[in-house]
Amino acid sequence: MGSAGSKKQSKQQRGLRERLLRTQEEPYGKLSEGQRKQSSRSPGGSDKDLNSPSCEGRNAPRAEGGGQQDTDDSDEDNEVGVYVRPNRPLRSMTYKMAIDMSHFIKEKGGLEGIYYSERRHRILDTYLENEEGIVSGWQNYTYGPGIRYPRTFGWLWKLVPVDIPEEERGAETSCLVHPAQISSWDDIHGETLAWRFDPLLAHDYVAFNRYPEEFGYQSGLPEKE
């Protein structure tokens, strides 16, 4: 029985990766390893280069065992590889759970370099609510512009603006369903954002320290009229 349960959990985890994280070999709309390292050397800057994304994957057959980041909007919303109903009692996100879930997601493929969108935001919320019983509403970030820091202390994934070079804004990335385009639609500042893992966020509550006004009464500052 234990073996069957482990296989079921492993299948659900693969479902999340296929639906949200996609495969590491997948080139469409994801930052390369070299580009991530270049960005990490410039904490205050944005990524200057991207893999050249393609819209071909929209109509091309899916490779066995993998998906394409620019085709996930055509999938069924409910097919995220998780339980239909919460598998555990509902509970609020805590610092320890945020740390654990951040590392869990990193170990299972990570969000690193994946374009952020409201739809992927909801998929992640749904997964953690149904699998871990964590009530949605915890996944909030500072308003921007610039780097968006998580407002939930312990969540180690921030959102970093990504610059798309002018020469790459041609036919390939002009496809409206491409995540490089959709991400900027979801952002009030029109920036294309990608997830970035930052372990230092476990010790430094950047969102609260830099932007206390965004926390309202919790900051101790007088609220605006």
UniProtKB/Swiss-Prot annotation:
Tell me, what does this protein do in biology? Factor of infectivity and pathogenicity, required for optimal virus replication. Alters numerous pathways of T-lymphocyte function and down-regulates immunity surface molecules in order to evade host defense and increase viral infectivity. Alters the functionality of other immunity cells, like dendritic cells, monocytes/macrophages and NK cells. One of the earliest and most abundantly expressed viral proteins.
Q: Where in the cell is it found?
A: Host cell membrane
Question: Covalent lipidation (N-myristoyl glycine) residues?
Answer: G2
Protein name from the UniProt record: Protein Nef
The source's superkingdom equals Viruses
Membrane topology summary: Lipid-anchor
* Remarks, miscellaneous: This isolate is from a Gambian case of 'neuro-AIDS'.
Organism this protein belongs to? Human immunodeficiency virus type 2 subtype B (isolate UC1) (HIV-2)
Task: Spell out the Gene3D superfamilies in the cross-references.
Answer: Nef Regulatory Factor
Q: Where is the composition biased (Basic and acidic residues)?
A: 15-36
Residue ranges of region Disordered? 1-85
The short sequence motif called PxxP sits at 86-89
- Which family does the similarity line name? Belongs to the lentivirus primate group Nef protein family.
Q: Which GO terms describe its cellular component?
A: host cell plasma membrane; membrane
Tell me which InterPro entries the record gives: HIV-1_Nef_core_sf, HIV_Nef
One Pfam annotation reads: F-protein
Provide the residue span(s) of the region labelled Acidic.
70-77
Give the multimer and partner information: Homodimer. Interacts with host CD247/TCRZ; this interaction induces down-regulation of cell surface TCR/CD3 complexes.
**Bias (Acidic residues):** 70-79
Q: What does the record say about domains?
A: The N-terminal domain is composed of the N-myristoyl glycine and of a cluster of positively charged amino acids. It is required for inner plasma membrane targeting of Nef and virion incorporation, and thereby for infectivity.
Principal localisation: host cell
This entry's Gene Ontology molecular function terms read: GTP binding
Start and end residues of each stretch annotated as Mediates dimerization? 122-138
Q: Which gene encodes it?
A: nef
